[in-house]
Amino acid sequence: MAKVSELYDVTWEEMRDKMRKWREENSRNSEQIVEVGEELINEYGSKLGDDIWIIYEQVMIAALDYGRDDLALFCLQELRRQFPGSHRVKRLTGMRFEAMERYDDAIQLYDRILQEDPTNTAARKRKIAIRKAQGKNVEAIRELNEYLEQFVGDQEAWHELAELYINEHDYAKAAFCLEELMMTNPHNHLYCQQYAEVKYTQGGLENLELSRKYFAQALKLNNRNMRALFGLYMSASHIASNPKASAKTKKDNMKYASWAASQINRAYQFAGRSKKETKYSLKAVEDMLETLQITQS
């Protein structure tokens, strides 16, 4: 097999810099990381200096993802020699257990890490990842709640908890998690959109009105958010046809839905689609408008 450096005519410095760039971007291109990283380690290890240790870790994680346990084990052994007793290296050992589906061994290892260092967030998150991999969502939810009691500012954990609640159809608790996220990230249009979707799913006039409000907010923050635009149309349409809504509320929401449908129509007209696709897309929007007119009459 040809070497990466020969195949693409790149120097070892360029390969090292590429690995650094992938780390900074949190890239999940495991195959490329394995190809470039394995050559760096084998051919240029002596030139890498202290960079070699972070590259060993990077390559090991990619190798697990790519199914190269031989390479993952080699990198892990080198890291163990250099950093005996390191919690970070122990966590990597646990990740290898996970890849081998030795979940009980991995959890025992993470528990030992947490006994020595209760603030080790990485070990806690790996335990939660195992529960999810096993389909044990209830246990994952319990552990995430315990984690958030100590690390309330972890936005990634709040979002993960919201997703788990959605999977369990516990929409009230999912909404609470998303409210926490919106408090700290008021300009994140995706959180507004997801909160609106949860409220829409809950149903009922009050939730539908909140849903429409937050779909509109998501659009205000990002006017290219087509999912929010469709959500605005759907929520306003349902409010307009809700028997509990007042006449004024129905009339106002008919206007909102009509506006949303016209914006969807316009977006499809300007999209770079084939004529056939545009024809069917526009037909769908026209059907929306026709439905509105029928409801209004």
From Swiss-Prot:
Question: What compartments host this protein?
Answer: Endoplasmic reticulum membrane
Under the heading Pfam families, the entry gives:
TPR_EMC2
Q: Which residues cross the membrane?
A: none
Q: Which domain of life is it from?
A: Eukaryota
Keyword line:
Acetylation, Endoplasmic reticulum, Membrane, Repeat, TPR repeat, Ubl conjugation
Tell me the membrane topology, using the record's own terms.
Peripheral membrane protein
User: Cross-referenced SMART domains, in alphabetical order?
Assistant: TPR
Which sequence positions carry the modification called N6-acetyllysine? K255
Please indicate if the UniProt record lists Ion transport as a keyword.
no
Mark the residues carrying the PTM N-acetylalanine: A2
Q: Among the entry's GO cellular component annotations, what is one?
A: endoplasmic reticulum membrane
TPR repeats span 87-120, 155-188, 192-225
Broad class of where this protein is predominantly found: endoplasmic reticulum
Q: How is it modified after translation?
A: Ubiquitinated when soluble in the cytoplasm, leading to its degradation by the proteasome. Interaction with EMC2 prevents its ubiquitination and degradation.
**Listed GO MF terms:** membrane insertase activity
Cross-referenced InterPro entries: EMC2-like, TPR-like_helical_dom_sf, TPR_EMC2, TPR_rpt
Question: Is Repressor among the key words of this record?
Answer: no
GO BP of this protein: protein insertion into ER membrane by stop-transfer membrane-anchor sequence; tail-anchored membrane protein insertion into ER membrane
Briefly state the protein's biological role: Part of the endoplasmic reticulum membrane protein complex (EMC) that enables the energy-independent insertion into endoplasmic reticulum membranes of newly synthesized membrane proteins. Preferentially accommodates proteins with transmembrane domains that are weakly hydrophobic or contain destabilizing features such as charged and aromatic residues. Involved in the cotranslational insertion of multi-pass membrane proteins in which stop-transfer membrane-anchor sequences become ER membrane spanning helices.
Q: Quote the subunit structure annotation.
A: Component of the ER membrane protein complex (EMC). Interacts with WNK1 (via amphipathic alpha-helix region); promoting the ER membrane protein complex assembly by preventing EMC2 ubiquitination.
**PANTHER family linked to this entry:** TETRATRICOPEPTIDE REPEAT PROTEIN
Q: What is the similarity comment for this entry?
A: Belongs to the EMC2 family.
User: What is this protein identified as?
Assistant: ER membrane protein complex subunit 2
Recite the lineage of the species.
Answer: Eukaryota, Metazoa, Chordata, Craniata, Vertebrata
Provide the gene name from the record: EMC2
